[in-house]
Regions:
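Mixed-charge, Lys/Arg-enriched low-complexity segments
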Residues: 2-13, 76-116
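Amphipathic alpha-helical segments
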Residues: 10-31
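Residue-level signal for the start and early helices of compact helical domains
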Residues: 16, 23-25, 36, 40, ...
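Generic secondary-structure transition motif, activating predominantly at the C-termini of alpha-helices
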Residues: 25, 29, 33, 99-102, ...
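Amphipathic, interaction-prone secondary-structure segments
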Residues: 27-72
Length: 116
């Protein structure tokens, strides 16, 4: 989805991200909330959702920079990924890296119980 996506506006970008997450994670993801959305004075928004019925995840987009964190109360644990700038993003890779970062933190017995 790479270059040019930023010019679509934050509503279209946030919808594209939610769609990509739903397609990648299917029944392992739920409860999307898009908030703090604005185009002026600069584009930014956040998306909160539950992954594997285990973690609350927050995706933040701020002036082209983007990333995920695991929400723990008012704090978050940042999740590393290879695509910090949205203009160069491959949403498939972003989802795969999110999946790897989250699954490594969830007990294997829990994932096996749900056939994940």
């Amino acid at each position: 989805m790479g270059s040019g996506m930023k010019s679509k506006g934050v509503h279209q970008i946030s919808n594209n991200i939610v769609t990509a997450l739903k397609e990648y994670f299917n029944d392992r993801i739920e409860g999307f909330t898009i908030y703090n959305i604005t185009d002026i004075p600069y584009p930014m928004f956040s998306i909160r959702f539950t992954l594997y019925n285990y973690y609350k995840i927050v995706y933040n987009y701020d002036r082209g920079r983007n990333g995920f964190s695991i929400s723990i109360g008012r704090d978050g644990i940042g999740l590393k990924h290879s695509q910090p700038w949205f203009d160069d993003i491959d949403l498939g890779v972003l989802c795969k890296e999110l999946d790897e970062n989250v699954r490594i933190r969830i007990p294997d017995k829990y994932l096996a119980y749900y056939n994940w």
